[in-house]
C-alpha cells in the first residue's frame, strides 16, 4: 500500500478511499478507459489497446478468452492512487449475458462511472446497467466517451440521459472541438480550458476558455450553478451575494450526486487520451467514500432485522465474498470489508454454514497479479486465499451474527445438454462444473433424472459458449453439446376445483387422505410463482397434515403435464378434506395433494409460456429494412425505431426460441455492420401452433412412460 495513504488515521483514510465500478454498454470503451486510468495513476507503465496490434490486450482483460474476443467477461479488481486517494476499481462486463458480474460488483461498490458512447448514446445495456445501479443505490457520474469519433454529439447523449434514464444529468464540462478536432475540455466549475498534450496526453495545459466557446461555457456554467444550488443553502446565498467559491460548487455537486439526485457529466476520449485525468479529479470530488454510504445487514439473532453497518475499523468485522476465482495461485475469494478489520492469522466465520476459517493470506489485486498485505479495514476490497465458500457469503469475526442481504440473481433462460467426448475427462468435467457454479450463480447445472444427461443453464448463448470454451481451455475437456433449449414454463388460465381421495389398503396400516379445494391463476402483477392458502375449518384435515398437502402440491411444480416444464403462477386453496385416525399419515396427504394438484391443473385450461426477450439492434440506416425483416421473421414485435445521423436503432420483443443463431444472420445481412443485444423481458403464452408442436414432440419423447 502506498505510504501516502498509510500515514492517515483510519477515518481520514476512509474519507480518501473510493470504491468505484466502471459500467457501460458493450464497446463503449470501458476497458480502454480503465487502462488509461491505470496508466495515469502509474499502476501500469505502457498503454495496450483492447484489440491492439501488439497482441498484449488490455491489462484488465486477464483471461485469454477475453483478450481474444475483446470483451470483458469477469470483473477484474484493481486499485490505484490519485492525489493522495486510494481508488479501488472493478472493471465490469458490458455484455448482457454477464449481468451477474455487474450485479455482484455493484453490490460492493460505493459509486460508479457510467460510460456512454458519444455517437451511440444511451443503448439497451446502458439502461440495464443503470437499473442495476438504481437497485443498489449507487451514486454515479457519467463519462461521454469517444468524442473523437465521427458523429459524436455529447449534448444529444445528455438529452438521452434525461429522457431514457430519467437522470438529472448536468454537464460539468464541455468539449473543446469534436471528432478529429477534439483537443480538450472546458471545466464549468473552474471556468478554465484544459488541453491534453504531449505523449499519451500526459501534459495538461490550463488556459483561458477559447473565444468561440465563451458564450456556451457561460450558459452551461449558469445551468450548473442553478442545478447545484438545489443541494446547498450556502451556495444559494453565495450566488445571491455574487461570491460563490469553487469549493462551494463542488460540495453542492457532491451532495446532489451522493443523494442520487444529480449526475455530473464528464467528456472526452479515452482512446485519444483526452479528459481522463479530469474525470479522475471528478471521482475524488463528487463520488462517495465508504463513509458516505449506508450499508445494511440482517441480524440473524433478531428475526433478520435490518441493521446499519459502520465503516469503522474498531467495530466487529463484517465482510462479504462477492466473487470467487480459480487463479494460478489456487482459489481466490474477493472480499469487501464493510465493518471492522480483517488481519492475517485471525479466525473468521461463514454465516451461511457457521464454518470457521483461518485467514492465511491477504492480497490487494491488480487484475491477475497480487500484492500481499497484513490487514484490511472497513472500505477495503481485497482477496483471500484458501477460503471455501460461495459467492454472496458473509463472514464475521464471531462477535456479530449478521448476514448481508442476498444479491438479486436473475433466473437462467437457456439450457444445453453437454457430455464429455472421452470418459477419461468426466472427473475434470465435474470439477469444472463445481467451480463455475460456485463462481457464477446464473450458471446452473443438473443431471436430468430420466435421460441421465448433464444440462447446463445460463443467461444466453454467449454465456454458455464462454463456459464451454473455458472447460476446454482450463480443464482440457472437449464437449459434445446438444441444441440450445428454451426455458419454457406452464401455467393455468382459469379457476378449477379439485377433490381427490387417496386410499390404499394392503394388509397392516393403510393410507388415507382426502384433499379438496380449488386452484386459480395468480395475477401477473403479484410476481409469485406459487401460493398456498389454507381455508380448512373444523379440523377436516388435521393441522399436522396441512404442510404435507403443501409439499405434495410443490412436488408437482417441477414438471407440468403439457411439456414437462416447471409450473408458475398458481394459487392453491384447500378448503375441505378428510382423514382416518389410523391410516392417515404425512405420506398419504402428500400423495393426495399430488393427485389433487394434477386433477385441478388439467381442468384449469393450462397453457405453455415462453421467455420473451427485449432485443435492441443498432446498425447503419441502409440496413434498416434487412434488420426489420430479420426480426419479423422471428415472431418479433417491433416496439420502436429511431434514426439519427445515418444510424438506426430498432427495439423489439422476440421469443427466445426464435433468437438462436441470430448473430450469424444479422452479421451476414448487414455486412457485419450491425450489432444486437438482448435481455429477458417476461414470459408470454406461446401461439397455438407452437404449443401443439411442442406437445406433440413431448408426447413422442415420453411415450414409453405412459
Swiss-Prot record:
GO terms for cellular component: cytoplasm. The keyword Ligase does not apply. GO terms for molecular function: GTP binding; GTPase activity; translation elongation factor activity. Residues 15-291 form the tr-type G domain. GTP binds at residues 24-31, 91-95, 145-148. SMART domains: EFG_C, EFG_IV. Its main location: cytoplasm. Signal peptide: none annotated. It is found in: Cytoplasm. It comes from the Bacteria. InterPro entries: EFG_II, EFG_III, EFG_III/V, EFG_IV, EFG_V-like, EFTu-like_2, G_TR_CS, P-loop_NTPase. Keywords: Cytoplasm, Elongation factor, GTP-binding, Nucleotide-binding, Protein biosynthesis. PANTHER family: ELONGATION FACTOR G, MITOCHONDRIAL. Belongs to the TRAFAC class translation factor GTPase superfamily. Classic translation factor GTPase family. EF-G/EF-2 subfamily. Catalyzes the GTP-dependent ribosomal translocation step during translation elongation. During this step, the ribosome changes from the pre-translocational (PRE) to the post-translocational (POST) state as the newly formed A-site-bound peptidyl-tRNA and P-site-bound deacylated tRNA move to the P and E sites, respectively. Catalyzes the coordinated movement of the two tRNA molecules, the mRNA and conformational changes in the ribosome. HAMAP family: EF_G_EF_2_B. This is Elongation factor G.
